[in-house]
Amino acid sequence: MVPMLWLTAYMAVAVLTAILLNVVYQLFFRLWNRTEPPMVFHWVPYLGSTISYGIDPYKFFFACREKYGDIFTFILLGQKTTVYLGVQGNEFILNGKLKDVNAEEVYSPLTTPVFGSDVVYDCPNSKLMEQKKFIKYGLTQSALESHVPLIEKEVLDYLRDSPNFQGSSGRVDISAAMAEITIFTAARALQGQEVRSKLTAEFADLYHDLDKGFTPINFMLPWAPLPHNKKRDAAHARMRSIYVDIITQRRLDGEKDSQKSDMIWNLMNCTYKNGQQVPDKEIAHMMITLLMAGQHSSSSISAWIMLRLASQPKVLEELYQEQLANLGPAGPDGSLPPLQYKDLDKLPFHQHVIRETLRIHSSIHSIMRKVKSPLPVPGTPYMIPPGRVLLASPGVTALSDEHFPNAGCWDPHRWENQATKEQENDKVVDYGYGAVSKGTSSPYLPFGAGRHRCIGEKFAYVNLGVILATIVRHLRLFNVDGKKGVPETDYSSLFSGPMKPSIIGWEKRSKNTSK
């Protein structure tokens, strides 16, 4: 008993000593070190500000910004992480040179077990740029035009067949429903009918298990034998085998005319600059990446859109009236005609709703890079040392009143007078997968910027636009049980989204579109 008491006492003294030394170090660090950004004060070494950051990143960022300014450093699970907020911070980090900053070292431990080896962050950046160029095949203008009827059909089939929407009215967990809809639309549009037909209950379970690999703990312990990691690895192996089987069978049979326009066929015929044909394993891994990338942000944002419309039914009716006015009735029953790509340009308020939701509810709150060489911060005395992690948060500028008055208010009408395009004088650069705008001069960067800017931005707008327009013309949405507003944000995953379950009410419209 006595030894145990002594051990407890020693441990308590050790902890208190560590805390005291940590506080003393921070005080002297501020006095002596003028070449590094200020350190966010914290009591517990190693843990640092991890908890407050993890609970609500934006609340943490804004509180630190008020106290320390746009540039500060905090401890994230023992790692010194320097945050640089604002438009200049976005430019500094997201457009950093390859020799200075590196994304692969930050994200590879998390993404490689999910996406697979030799793709995305598990390969040299030059190879990733080639892979992005291959993938852009499915994101051309003609491809996007062909996606519209496919996406619309998937949404209509879901509204007709899903148990969530049987009868004339009911309730639905809209986060779960939009996750299902967006995996169907992403698979059908980006991957083809052959892959879409394999989205059975088994495939959905595999996707779910694979998605669990993006839990924050996997930044630190990606290969730990935890239950969710075992399921992740099994799901990846099974999903890869599904794609490899498709590829193998196609090589035996030869491509059919109906397949010659899909992504798998495209990748099967791609060759790297060094003359190597893309291996089947890498094709499978790129297809897994494409499916998850095409679904993740669309799932979260589409759920937020529906939740916002349910909380403000008047906005939903504005959208409906826009379709009636600009697309016009067609058949004898007054039903609206099937959507076409050109129709999306006739629905500006639909685009405003999407943009405003992306502004407030971006699914990625932090973008990180690893510093590779001493990095001076222009206009400051600061020098960021190698090994430090840099963190940009474009969502902070999007939520700042200086750029968007009353920024915390969801108001799609603000975009009627708000410039939506990047500044005309913004530089255009080719990182190896086609010319893109650097983009960082804008306070609105829902798809990132620089060499790692999302290449699926146009597809995302098309996908979200068609999903939104289709649901608006078929359903009314509303909050239930007297609830006001929308749910809180769940930051427990790498991709934030609404707290689950997110229950709203729905009611089917009359076949006559005037009712």
Swiss-Prot record:
Heme binds at C454. Its EC number is 1.14.14.154. It comes from the Eukaryota. Pathway: Steroid metabolism; ergosterol biosynthesis. It is a single-pass membrane protein. Induction: Expression is decreased upon exposure to voriconazole. Expression is regulated by the GATA transcription factor sreA during hypoxia. The chain crosses the membrane at residues 7-29. Changing M220 to I/K/T/V: Leads to resistance to azole compounds. GO terms for biological process: ergosterol biosynthetic process; methylation. One of its GO terms (molecular function) is heme binding. PROSITE patterns: CYTOCHROME_P450. Disulfide bonds: none annotated. One of its GO terms (cellular component) is endoplasmic reticulum membrane. Sterol 14alpha-demethylase, encoded by cyp51A and cyp51B, that plays a critical role in the third module of ergosterol biosynthesis pathway, being ergosterol the major sterol component in fungal membranes that participates in a variety of functions. The third module or late pathway involves the ergosterol synthesis itself through consecutive reactions that mainly occur in the endoplasmic reticulum (ER) membrane. In filamentous fungi, during the initial step of this module, lanosterol (lanosta-8,24-dien-3beta-ol) can be metabolized to eburicol. Mutations of Gly-54 or Met-220 lead to the resistance to azoles, clinical drugs used to inhibit the activity and kill Aspergillus fumigatus cells during infections. Duplication in tandem of a 34 bp sequence in the cyp51A promoter located at positions -288 and -322 from the start codon also leads to azole resistance, when associated with a mutation of Leu-98. This is Sterol 14-alpha demethylase cyp51A.
